[in-house]
Swiss-Prot record:
Belongs to the chaperonin (HSP60) family. Forms a cylinder of 14 subunits composed of two heptameric rings stacked back-to-back. Interacts with the co-chaperonin GroES. This is Chaperonin GroEL. It comes from the Bacteria. Keywords: ATP-binding, Chaperone, Cytoplasm, Isomerase, Nucleotide-binding. The gene is groEL. One of its GO terms (molecular function) is isomerase activity. The keyword NAD does not apply. Its EC number is 5.6.1.7. GO terms for cellular component: cytoplasm. One of its GO terms (biological process) is protein refolding. The lineage of its organism: Bacteria, Pseudomonadati, Pseudomonadota, Alphaproteobacteria, Hyphomicrobiales.
Length: 547
């Protein structure tokens, strides 16, 4: 085991605070509408330019191990806030730095760190209640666009794209952000359920120009096993032919004789048909087949349920107004499933999302939820250079997450105004002077956002804070973009409650841990042993006889 270096008390906290300051100072320059960019060197390729707090935080690694510990703790604040709310990473970093700085001063003055922590916790709980009480629910597309615009640093087009996407696919729908191949940013919406499996044979195509199989008002047969021959299916195939409607078979696989027979019948024109592999694997495949069954009002043909292919009747098949199948994807639009059944399935998947601890499972469940609940929208981010595209993609990701958070918990006045106002509403009292000091630490820290936004805009922070607090209106704040004071919500400058709340709670949590730290342990740096050079050759004097 390597030897360790240990630092105690004030020395430890000062080292840690220095690390916190280095990371926070690099991140906080990005805050607000006039925040600056940070350029990050890459080991290969062009450097990356970003205004995304968490991207900056993730790149910082300090040489001094004790300083690095402080920096990494604050990095954790940014990452955790990003994971939960999807935005607010810079906010969380600024708050954490402010609480740690003030807390460190209090500990150095001889106050009890544990009482300071209790005071901080009391104040944060009261601020969270105040934020939730002030929250304004958002409903219109304009309000959604406002949130997106603010989070994308004033890019109105981003706000509009996100609002349009959410309008088309619903609040639960999946919206993905991809890099475009062109200079323009565009929005593409896929309505209905789409999964990543295409036709099993190109002979099923109905539109040879586009290589797409479009089947209108089709029946859907869902089978969880492989289909190798069609003998067992003949009764149901004949019943479908009688109706004159097309049929889409979704099964684990359709192979050999079964596939050949279907293709021959399709080419002869007797049967409008297409076959597709079922999406997913294992248990997830079963669940997704069940989702498709509920969406189309059909039944999954499964031995587990005691249903055999021979006994399948027309009413066990699903129905859909339109099914489009390309080489890679299948899209089911307007399934005939009962609304109540779909809502029940959505509620069931939501419950599974709450319970799961795996990020991968959660992501897959959210995809399934979106496919049932609305559809999928893709925002393709364009730009003149690769660096510009990456920077815009960062901003759109943030804006999208902020917008989702706003829909969930509502909005409050932006620009740090909500927290600044909350600092005057803290009425809770500590049981002793040290707890009271902890409450005051939070009061002062809540001003740090407005101060930093003003500083980044080149304004005098103290004057801005004073002017805002002079007015008794909760919505009154400072628009750093235009340099005007006024009603923040009317000006469209808003923050999602979830983002502000998460940032404050995470910042206070980690800052409290740093304040109550009394010892730090790190590995001693390894001493490099002297290099193993060539042995001494005695001045090479022994070579004289070689001449």
């Amino acid at each position: 085991m390597a030897a360790k270096e240990i630092k105690f008390g004030r020395t430890a906290r000062e080292k840690m605070l220095h690390g916190v300051d280095i990371l926070a100072d690099a991140v906080k320059v990005t805050l607000g509408p006039k925040g600056r960019n940070v350029i990050i060197d890459k080991s290969f390729g062009a450097p990356r330019i970003t205004k995304d707090g968490v991207s900056v935080a993730k790149e910082i690694e300090l040489e001094d191990k004790f300083e690095n510990m402080g920096a990494q703790m604050v990095r954790e604040v940014a990452s955790k806030t990003n994971d939960i709310a999807g935005d607010g990473t810079t906010t969380a970093t600024v708050l954490a730095q402010a609480i740690v700085r003030e807390g460190n001063k209090a500990v150095a003055a001889g106050m009890n760190p544990m009482d300071l922590k209790r005071g901080i916790d009391l104040a944060v709980a009261e601020v969270v209640k105040d934020l939730q009480a002030k929250a304004k629910k958002i409903s219109t597309s304009e309000e959604v666009a406002q949130v997106g615009t603010i989070s994308a640093n004033g890019d109105t087009q981003v706000g509009k794209d996100i609002a349009e996407a959410m309008q088309k696919v619903g609040n639960e729908g999946v919206i993905t952000v991809e890099e475009a191949k062109t200079a323009e940013t565009e929005l593409e919406v896929v309505e209905g359920m789409q999964f990543d499996r295409g036709y099993l044979s190109p002979y099923f195509v109905t539109n040879p120009e586009k290589m797409v199989a479009d089947l209108e008002d089709a029946y859907v047969l869902l089978h969880e096993k492989k289909l190798s021959n069609l003998q067992a299916m003949l009764p149901v195939l004949e019943a479908v032919v009688q109706t004159g409607k097309p049929l889409v078979i979704i099964a684990e696989d359709v192979e050999g004789e079964a596939l050949a027979t279907l293709v021959v019948n399709k080419l002869r024109g007797g049967l409008k048909i297409a076959a597709v592999k079922a999406p997913g694997f294992g248990d997830r495949r079963k669940a997704m087949l069940e989702d498709i069954a509920i969406l189309t009002g059909g039944t999954v043909i499964s031995e587990d349920l005691g249903i055999k292919l021979e006994t399948v009747t027309l009413d066990m098949l699903g129905r859909a107004k339109k099914i489009s199948i390309t080489k890679e994807n299948t899209t089911i639009v307007d399934g005939a499933g009962q609304k109540s059944d779909i809502e029940g399935r959505v509620a069931q998947i939501k419950a599974q999302i709450e319970e799961t601890s795996s990020d991968y499972d959660r992501e897959k469940l959210q995809e399934r939820l979106a496919k049932l609940a609305g559809g999928v929208a893709v925002i393709r981010v364009g730009g003149s250079t690769e660096i510009e595209v990456k920077e815009r993609k960062d901003r759109i990701d943030d804006a999208l997450n902020a917008t989702r958070a706003a829909v969930q918990e509502g909005i409050v006045p932006g620009g740090g105004t909500a927290l600044l106002r909350s600092s005057t509403k803290i009425t809770v009292k500590g049981v002793n002077d040290d707890q009271e000091a902890g409450i005051n630490i939070v009061r002062r820290a809540l001003q740090s956002l407005v101060r930093q936004i003003a500083t980044n805009a080149g304004d005098e922070a103290s004057i801005i804070v004073g002017k805002i607090l002079d007015k008794d209106n909760d919505n009154y704040g400072y628009n750093a973009q235009t340099g005007e004071f006024g009603d923040m919500i009317a000006m469209g400058i808003v923050d999602p409650v979830k983002v502000v709340r998460t940032a404050l709670q995470n910042a206070a949590s980690v800052a409290s841990l740093l304040i109550t730290t009394e010892a730090m342990i790190a590995e001693l740096p390894k001493k490099d042993s002297a290099g193993g050079g060539m042995p001494d050759m005695g001045g090479m004097g022994g070579m004289g006889g070689m001449m």
